[in-house]
């Protein structure tokens, strides 16, 4: 997953209602917000000047929780001064004194915010959460005050209207058109009174998004399954039990503790033979944020959906999705929904055939009835064993984390792009589990820094993602500092970190995002790296997943952690053959979440406040995805992607991007597979380009034609010819 909350704002000029400049503070009211004394900011703050560490990497060993708030406030205040100077420049507007000046603004803010965003997502604590609560409405006001600045927009519009006569190079012309469209989308053409209404909506939205995230993090932590009865853990491996015991010990509890993942289904359900335990864990997951307690998210999300509809109406759109998709590849919610709707019949039909396979098992207990979702993973694993003669416990010893990283992820990057990696233990990190690598070009030229933070923690958001601490820009003279975060099960002390093949795929996926950021080769930060539409940003990451099962790569990293022996060819073949196993279920749960997202965000402003349970049931029926044994991958109440992480009206992007990546991989296979020439061409024509040209044209030029949906259906085993395999 690509974290978009910051990237939607990345290099957009912002303003704030809090002013703190070089230790001299002043405040003004921002709506009805509670005022807070400003903290001092000066040379002792680690964000005061650009970091002197390699690549300007943050000095995490020097940064204290108390440093973030004054640095963020000072950064916003400084950027406001810079932007006001641009807006009030007495000289006629030019590309240099307006667009380039805007691209240079906000560097202090970026330094502080990027590091703050990293730690609050991956290593938060109560003090950071307070800062987050305090800053959330201010960052919304910060953006609005500039997006809605009449003088600034007048200069932007003047240059936009004259762009054809300015002899701009292609990237500069793209910047003019992109920024103009973004300002219009943000409401620059609204009346003054409507701008004030929009500011209040944006402020409330930012506050509620932060509230949702905090509630969900606490709800997910509280939902962990605790037991002192070892019989309830029957089916788990010794390593899994040891990790659960370590988890309990870390929480000062007796017995074992199984933390919740962010998805509806939980990995341990595939192994637990105790049906009562499975059902209890599933219930913990399903109802984690709907218990009527302080962590219940339903009221928060219902208001978020409502105010987003109100915001869209104010901006002249029938619903939020119609507004939000204007700059995406899909363009309209109707196009996105048609795309999803076309996939539903094949996915649900395949899921139904998979349900029949489960019902045919000799030890299936449900009396011939459809499988209960709490039992699906366990019995699907039995089908996997019977059908492919292997289970996940057999393969994990061949997927030791460090081996997968160095001989899989890094190996593929070397074969395709010539990259090499050197661990930098001298650089500070935000948590002891984090590792840092310097990345080099084939000729030894430094390219980037890359951090990886792979193990689950209570104070870390669920899921996996990529983001940047420093973005690439020729204008600013910066190279990328990028990080990947995941939530793999941390082994007991002295034990190896053994992964499932899904975990392996996640590593390749997130590193695909990292490559997109590291290969950025653009002038302007607003167009650099992963600053692309949602339905394109997942394409490079999902494309990189394919190399996890590519024979030459797989054989290189799939080695037993004790003996170093390669995975037996027969077992490896079974894994590859089983790639389409359970894809009916997997794809149906993804489509259900995608359609649910679109249903929430196509509500008109006139719709009343929704009851999430009723809305969800009706939405799934309406989209033909009310399948009793396949719940959505995310229930509305814990769908963090759409309520806080920038994927609102955009979760379809994963599937849209999958169409692009499957077609792209087919191109590689048709042109010689994993070769340096193919990798360099892909890097040059796609990965390095960021948002410097129309993404559809960029993709079509590289591919040599428009994408087709057929490779997606084939790779998921959803064509009729694939069903019996």
Question: Which residues does each PLM region occupy?
Answer:
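Short pre-active-site segment immediately N-terminal to the catalytic Zn-binding motif
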Residues: 489-508
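Active-site-proximal, well-structured secondary-structure segments within enzyme catalytic domains
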Residues: 171, 175, 207, 214, ...
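Bacterial N-terminal signal peptides that target proteins for export
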Residues: 3-16
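Short His/Asp/Glu-rich catalytic/ion-coordination signatures at enzyme active sites or charged loops
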Residues: 52-67, 116-138, 158-200, 259-299, ...
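Bacterial N-terminal signal peptides
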Residues: 15-25
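Cleavable N-terminal signal peptides
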Residues: 29-30
């Amino acid at each position: 997953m690509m974290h978009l909350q910051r990237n939607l704002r990345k290099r957009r000029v912002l303003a704030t209602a809090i002013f703190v400049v070089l230790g001299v503070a002043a405040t003004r009211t921002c709506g009805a917000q509670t005022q807070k004394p400003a903290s001092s900011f000066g040379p002792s703050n680690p964000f005061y000047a650009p970091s002197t560490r390699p690549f300007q990497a943050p000095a995490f060993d020097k940064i204290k929780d108390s440093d973030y708030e004054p640095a963020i406030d000072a950064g916003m205040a400084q950027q406001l001064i810079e932007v006001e100077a641009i807006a009030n420049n007495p000289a006629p507007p030019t590309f240099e004194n307006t667009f380039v000046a805007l691209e240079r603004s906000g560097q202090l803010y970026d330094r502080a915010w990027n590091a703050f965003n990293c730690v609050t997502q991956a290593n938060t604590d109560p003090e950071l959460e307070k800062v987050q609560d305090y800053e959330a409405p201010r960052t919304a006001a910060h953006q609005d005050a500039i997006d809605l600045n009449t003088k600034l927009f007048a200069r932007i519009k003047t240059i936009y209207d004259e762009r054809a006569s300015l002899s701009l190079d292609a990237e500069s012309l793209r910047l003019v058109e992109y920024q103009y469209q973004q300002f219009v989308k943000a409401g620059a053409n609204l009346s003054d009174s409507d701008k004030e209404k929009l500011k209040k909506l944006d402020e409330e939205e930012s506050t509620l998004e932060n509230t949702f995230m905090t509630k969900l993090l606490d709800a997910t932590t509280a939902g962990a399954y605790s037991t002192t009865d070892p019989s309830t853990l029957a089916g788990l491996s010794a390593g899994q039990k040891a990790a659960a015991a370590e988890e309990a010990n870390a929480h000062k509890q007796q017995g074992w503790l199984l933390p919740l993942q962010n998805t509806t289904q939980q990995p341990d359900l595939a192994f637990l033979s105790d049906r009562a335990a499975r059902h209890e864990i599933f219930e913990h997951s399903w109802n984690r944020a709907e218990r009527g307690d302080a962590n219940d998210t339903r009221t928060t999300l219902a208001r978020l959906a409502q105010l987003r509809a109100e915001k869209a109406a104010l901006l002249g759109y029938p619903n939020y999705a119609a507004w939000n998709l204007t700059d995406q590849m899909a363009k309209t919610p109707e196009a996105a929904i048609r795309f999803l709707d076309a996939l539903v019949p094949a996915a649900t039909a395949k899921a139904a055939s998979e349900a029949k396979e489960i019902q045919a098992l000799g030890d299936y207990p449900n009396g011939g009835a459809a499988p209960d979702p709490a039992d699906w993973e366990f019995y699907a694993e039995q089908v996997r064993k019977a059908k492919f003669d292997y289970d996940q416990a057999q393969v994990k010893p061949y997927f030791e984390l460090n081996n997968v990283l160095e001989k899989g992820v890094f190996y593929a990057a070397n074969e395709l792009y010539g990259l090499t990696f050197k661990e930098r233990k001298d650089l500070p990190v935000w948590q002891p589990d984090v590792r840092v690598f310097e990345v080099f070009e084939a000729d030894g030229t430094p390219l980037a820094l890359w951090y990886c933070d792979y193990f689950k923690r209570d104070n870390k958001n669920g899921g996996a993602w990529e983001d940047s601490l420093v973005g690439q820009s020729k204008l600013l003279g910066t190279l990328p500092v990028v990080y990947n975060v995941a939530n793999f099960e941390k082994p007991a002390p002295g034990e190896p970190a053994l992964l499932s093949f899904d975990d392996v795929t996640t590593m390749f996926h997130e590193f695909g995002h990292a490559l997109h950021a590291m290969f950025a080769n653009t002038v302007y930060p607003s167009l650099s790296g992963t600053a692309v539409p949602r339905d394109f940003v997942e394409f490079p990451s999902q494309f990189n997943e394919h190399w996890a099962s590519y024979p030459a790569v797989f054989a290189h990293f799939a080695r037993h952690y004790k003996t170093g022996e390669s995975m037996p060819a027969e077992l490896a073949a079974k894994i590859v053959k089983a790639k389409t196993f359970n894809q009916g279920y997997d794809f149906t749960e993804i489509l259900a979440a995608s359609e649910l997202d679109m249903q929430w965000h196509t509500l008109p402003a006139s719709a009343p406040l929704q009851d999430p349970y009723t809305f969800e049931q009706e939405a799934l029926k309406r989209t033909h995805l009310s399948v009793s044994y396949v719940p959505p991958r995310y229930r509305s109440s814990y769908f963090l992607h759409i309520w806080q992480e920038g994927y609102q009206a955009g979760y379809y992007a994963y599937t849209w991007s999958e169409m692009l990546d499957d077609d792209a991989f087919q191109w590689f296979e048709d042109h010689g597979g994993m070769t340096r020439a193919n990798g360099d061409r892909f890097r040059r024509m796609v990965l390095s380009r960021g948002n410097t040209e129309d993404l559809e044209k960029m993709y079509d030029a590289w591919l040599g034609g428009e994408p087709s949906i057929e490779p997606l259906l084939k790779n998921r085993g959803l064509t009729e010819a694939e069903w019996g395999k």
